[in-house]
Amino acid sequence: MRSTTRVGLVVLCVGIAAQVAAHLGDVVLAFWDAQAHLDIARRVIDSTTPGLQMLGTVWLPVPHLLYLPFTQIDPLWWNGLAGGIVGMAAFVLMAVSVHDIVRRRSERAAAAWIAVAIVACNPTLLYLQTTAMTEPLLLGFLAAATARLDHWREGGEDRLLLGAGAWTALAVGSRYDGWFFAAVAAVAVLAISRRIGPVLRFVALPAVVVAAWLVFNAVYFGDPLEFQRGIWSAASQQATLAGEGLLPTRGAPLLDLGYYLGAVGLTSGWLLLAVGTLGSLLALRHREHRVVLLLLWSVLPFNVLALFAGQSAIALPWTDPAGVLNLRYGIMLLPALAVGAVLGLEHLATRRGMLLALAVVGALQVGHFAWNWPAAVGGLREGLAIRDGDAAQMRASRWLATHYDRGRVLVAPAVNISPRTRIRLRDRVYPWTWELGPAALDAPAEVVDWVVVDRRAQGDPVTKAVAADTSFDRRFQLAFRERELEIWQRR
């Protein structure tokens, strides 16, 4: 059996075990974003207005297109496994690619397995790959692209460049980190080949994805840059945070670096951050390691620049304001730290010394995660904070999962309806839903069978509609209440 196959099977078993644990721990749907990703994929078909336009512009489309076939299977959508299947595949891809990179760079087979163990046993990544979050997908695509580029650097075969371009195209269509990686990789290809032909072969597919995204935005939303300057864009959301004084990182490069490295420490591990950084610096002295490490480390300047430009936000437990916002972004540096730690220590110690040093570091890191569980596991800590931060919404979703039987549901904009409720997306009516939304606000009993009201939200159109309907209490009965969150059922 080939070593790549063995790695894939071992990591697959680890991923499956994590999937089981996450489902038993009820954390698969902890992130609101994970639920939204599943719903976006589902609504391309299950919607009052089905079609590709339902992909929207909030997020890039590749993850939702990958989730789409699985979300059409009701049980996989309800329990979140539709996202976990794709996430686990990306998890295996990343581990196999890391093994490929280190095996090619090192003369010791054990070094590649150690790098795999570092990434495959990281608790934040193990958790995220059970969800529909997009970070594992990006890590898988970037690692695969880096492995192909490294292989091309040695052999120079054009098909390897096309393969690297294909993986990069998937990264470009998954997260904007991929756009930065594509630019860095294109420069690397040019520096290695000193010819424009190889660069064009590499960037062809990523360029097609970018062009397709611009055309999609222009055709469906009237602006090719809707994803950047629309009301749901990251820039718009961060502008709101900045207006409230909640974006201290904008325009502060050193602070940005500190924030991002804090997120790395809380997700990838503080010891690994130290050892991986030192190892990478040592490995950079060797020419053959430079391209791989620079590609894997490209996520660092991207995230720092995103914070600097106000396009991203991170909150740490010790910052002001304190929080656990987007801690998961730190996991992007995990492959770079794993590869750097192994390659760097390999040049400092004998095989036995390297194994001993990494075993000690690994034991200390695992002990830290276990001693302060789950606070020391940044991704899980963030997910739990979101899940438990609004207990009313969580209980409302669980109540609907056992009491909802049929009919349309008018939903307040601020309320998140979980896939676990089993309410089809075509039966969810929001104030903006084409034709049905305005009609439901005007006469709820004529359009819907259920109404979800959130009296906490000022100016909520559903709350206003309920208050304005003099016959509402006669036509609907209160079936559930958790603080100001109410669910009404038609009599």
Describe the role of every protein-language-model region.
Residues 151-155, 161, 181-210, 215, ...:
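Perimembrane helix-loop-helix junctions
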Residues 59, 124-137:
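Short acidic/glycine- and proline-prone juxtamembrane loop motifs at membrane-interface regions
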Residues 190, 259-303, 340-341, 358-359:
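Hydrophobic, aromatic-rich transmembrane alpha-helices
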Residues 39-40, 55-76, 89:
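Short hydrophobic/aromatic helix or loop-helix immediately within or flanking a transmembrane segment
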